[in-house]
């Protein structure tokens, strides 16, 4: 089971409800894809490493902490990876960046790529999405270049 908390406070009755529910979800999560920004706001994590460690303590086997333009911090099989996020030129709209990253990462894992390779592919897809308006790429763009291998 993969899980991106993607916390939206206005959908919950209280912060306590958010934290209690998400903590229960982690007990059945195999792959977690949290955003450090969300986690720092709701859990008080002071760094992406804090987020990674908190998810690991809950028993999540594979964790990828997204951090906007900051480095991705990840862990699987006890191995920690810190992967800088490439600079993206021509950013138009950051909507969907995290979802695109997740799609690229999970598709790559399913295709047999290791965790670091999957992070790179997720970063590429997320980076391309933010160069266009809207939260997803058109079929024409997606079916060309480095994204062809996702289809």
Language-model-detected regions and their locations in the chain:
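Conserved phosphate-binding/catalytic region of the ribokinase-like
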Residues: 44-151
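Conserved beta-alpha-beta core of the PfkB/ribokinase-like small-molecule kinase fold
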Residues: 1-54, 69-72
């Amino acid at each position: 089971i993969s899980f991106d908390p993607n916390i939206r406070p206005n959908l919950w009755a209280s912060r306590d409800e958010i934290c209690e529910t998400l903590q229960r979800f982690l007990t059945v999560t195999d792959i977690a894809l949290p955003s450090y920004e969300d986690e720092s706001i709701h859990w008080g994590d002071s760094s992406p490493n804090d987020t990674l460690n908190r998810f690991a303590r809950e028993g999540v086997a594979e964790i990828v902490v997204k951090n906007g333009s900051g480095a991705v911090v990840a862990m699987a099989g006890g191995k920690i990876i810190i992967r800088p996020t490439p600079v993206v030129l021509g950013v138009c709209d950051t909507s969907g960046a995290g979802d695109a990253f997740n799609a690229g990462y999970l598709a790559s894992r399913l295709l047999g790529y290791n965790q670091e390779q999957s992070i790179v592919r997720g970063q590429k897809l997320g980076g391309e999405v933010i160069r266009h308006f809207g939260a997803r790429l058109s079929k024409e763009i997606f079916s060309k270049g480095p994204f062809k291998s996702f289809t």
